[in-house]
Each structure stands twice: as structure tokens, then as C-alpha cells.
Regions:
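Short, aromatic/basic-rich helix-turn unit that serves as a nucleic-acid recognition element
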Residues: 3, 10-42, 73-75
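A Lys/Arg-rich helix-loop hairpin that forms a DNA/phosphate-binding surface
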Residues: 6-12, 31-34, 47-69
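N-terminal DNA-binding recognition helix of tyrosine site-specific recombinases/integrases
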Residues: 42-45, 74-106, 140, 174, ...
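Basic, Lys/Arg- and aromatic-enriched nucleic-acid-binding interface segment
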Residues: 78, 82, 101, 105-175
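Basic, Lys/Arg-rich DNA-contacting stretches centered on the C-terminal catalytic core
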Residues: 111, 146-154, 176, 187-225, ...
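Short, basic (Lys/Arg/His-rich) helix/loop patches that form interaction surfaces
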Residues: 150-154, 226, 241-301
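Catalytic-site neighborhood detector that most strongly recognizes the C-terminal catalytic loop/helix
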Residues: 197-199, 303-320
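C-terminal catalytic core of Y-nucleophile DNA break-rejoin enzymes
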Residues: 198-263
Length: 320
């Protein structure tokens, strides 16, 4: 009986520690392994590059000085690198309770909390997206830039993606929660759902917090109070970029992105539509309602954020 609940991880490699933690915690957090998949992949890349097996005690300030630039060179945003860092430190802290020895500098890492590519849309832009007639105006190929005629099934897909994005702007939820909506989530003009990521229950009074309640109810009724689009999030973002590319206009503006690491600032230029994703809808909801002077407590109750610090990262003011 005692052996059943004892755990000695003193000889485990870092990836073995991750596997063991995910195995144990998956009983209460079924999707935890998916959350750590990127970390495992990047650690395996490092092991392959240097021909070694990474042990927990090898994670030090020296390791971080190599690992962070390595992730940046692979094209990861600093917000994503920060997520990888947090996951790795969480694994080390958990493993240390079961015999794993840590280097004293295992958590001495500074990933810039500095990224200026956050995008929030205005109410006019959201309305423009909703009212854009897909296939009725000259449409250019997403890749070859030649004028083309969209097929009926492609038009239907882009319409569903458009409605899904606009609905996200009006309800302020993550994509993983929007795909799960059903009539049971709506009662007396209020939307509520237990969020998949946090387990928090949020409440959105549609008439007072949605960006446009008329459009919100029109979309909901069109799809029987279910999600307009339920495909893979990567496909969703690809279709969203294609939709915004077809709309053109303000979404084709150049945006300069400044990133800072190890004291060096680098700048890259992208078109605005390339920076808009599923999460931009949630940012737009938070930013617009903040600018409307809606009480912060009501917005947090709608977005499900448990702290103002976490919520503030969603706000994109004019200078951003």
C-alpha cells in the first residue's frame, strides 16, 4: 500500500519528469499533456542538437541563456516562450517534491514580457467584417493574388468563420469555449459557461456587454444557438486570415513589431491581418468594454479572469 503512493524520481530525465507529472495530473486535468506538448518537443530538439539527455539538474541560468534564444530563432513569440518557461519551472517545482535535485539558478530567466503585436478591433471594424459580402465583391487569391471566383463550399466556410469571429468579439470567450456553446448556455438574454481552461464560470449579459447585441442575436439564431464553426483552431485562423485578406482595406496596413531580448531590440513588419487570430476577438471584447467605461468587475465576470493583472494583458489601447 505504501509503495502504491510513493514516488522516487531522483533518476528521471527532464522529459520523464514531464511524462510522469502529466500522467498523475491527467486524472483531474485530462488535457494537461497537450499543454506540455510544445515544451517536450523543444527539449527533444535540444537533445537531438547536442546529442544529450537533459536532466533536471542541468536547468540553470546557463541553460536558459541558450534555450530562450533557441526558441526565438525558431520563430516563437515571446509570449509563447514565456508560456514554455512557466511550464518548465512548474515541472521542476513539482518534481523536486519527489527526489529530483535542482540547480540553484533553475528559475533565473528573464523572458521579456514585452511584445507590441497585440491586436484589438474597433466596433466599426467588427461591423465591417460582419457585413462583408463574401463572394459578392472582387476576390483575390490568398496566395497568387489573382482575381478568382470562390466556390460555394468555400464561401460557406468563410461565412461561418466570419460569424464565429464576430460572435467571439461579442461574447469575449476563448475559441475552445465558443465551439462548445449550445442553447443551454443562454437564458434571459444572458450567456454563461464554465470555461474549459480555468474551470471558472463566466456570465455575459448580452444586451449590455456585447459589442452589438442585434448582430449577436442574429448570429445565434442563424445557427440555433450553436457555434457557427467548430473546426480545428489552426484551420480556423488560416480561414480568418484569408477572410481578412479578401476584405482588405484597414486590415492590409503595415504593423511594426518590436521585440527585445538580451538588451537587443529587433523590428519586423507584418500586415495587420496577419496578426489577427481567434484570440483577437477576446482582446477586442475586453478592450472595447474597458473603453466604454463598463465597471471592471462586470468585464472580469464576463471574461472569467480571476485577477486584474491577467486581465490587463488583454487591453490594447490606441498606441498599440
Amino acid at each position: 500500500m505504501n509503495d502504491m503512493f510513493s514516488l522516487d524520481m531522483s533518476r528521471c530525465s527532464l522529459t520523464e519528469c514531464i511524462d510522469k507529472m502529466c500522467e498523475i495530473k491527467s486524472r483531474s486535468h485530462p488535457k494537461i499533456k497537450q499543454n506540455y506538448k510544445m515544451l517536450v518537443n523543444k527539449l527533444e530538439d535540444i537533445e537531438k542538437q547536442f546529442g544529450c539527455t537533459i536532466m533536471p539538474a542541468m536547468i540553470s541560468s546557463v541553460f536558459w541563456n541558450h534555450f530562450v534564444p533557441f526558441l526565438a530563432e525558431q520563430g516563437l513569440k515571446y509570449s509563447t516562450i514565456g508560456h514554455v518557461k512557466a511550464n518548465l519551472i512548474a515541472v521542476l517545482n513539482w518534481s523536486s517534491k519527489y527526489g529530483v535535485k535542482l540547480n540553484q539558478s533553475y528559475n533565473e530567466v528573464d523572458v521579456p514580457n514585452y511584445i507590441s503585436s497585440k491586436i484589438a478591433l474597433t466596433p466599426d471594424e467588427i461591423s465591417h467584417i460582419y457585413h462583408f459580402k463574401i463572394g459578392k465583391e472582387p476576390t483575390f487569391s490568398f496566395r497568387s493574388k489573382k482575381v478568382l471566383k470562390l466556390r460555394k463550399n468555400k464561401i460557406e466556410t468563410l461565412e461561418r468563420v466570419r460569424d464565429m469571429f464576430v460572435l467571439g468579439c461579442n461574447l469575449g470567450q476563448r475559441y475552445s469555449d465558443l465551439v462548445r456553446i449550445s442553447p443551454e448556455n443562454f437564458k434571459n438574454g444572458q450567456f454563461s459557461i464554465v470555461q474549459q481552461k480555468t474551470g471558472n464560470k463566466c456570465f455575459v449579459p448580452i444586451n449590455s456587454l456585447s459589442i452589438d447585441s442585434r448582430i449577436t442575436f442574429a448570429i445565434l439564431e442563424k445557427y440555433g444557438y450553436h457555434a457557427p464553426y467548430t473546426g480545428d483552431i489552426n484551420n480556423y485562423n488560416t480561414y480568418l486570415h484569408e477572410l481578412l485578406y479578401h476584405i482588405g482595406e484597414d486590415f492590409m496596413d503595415e504593423v511594426h513589431i518590436d521585440n527585445k531580448i538580451n538588451g537587443v531590440i529587433t523590428r519586423e513588419t507584418k500586415l495587420r491581418y496577419q496578426l489577427i487570430s481567434s484570440h483577437s476577438a477576446r482582446r477586442s471584447f475586453a478592450t472595447i468594454n474597458t473603453m466604454r467605461n463598463i465597471p471592471r468587475s462586470k468585464i472580469l465576470r464576463a471574461t472569467g479572469h480571476s485577477s486584474e493583472k491577467a486581465f490587463n494583458r488583454y487591453i490594447c489601447y490606441d498606441d498599440e
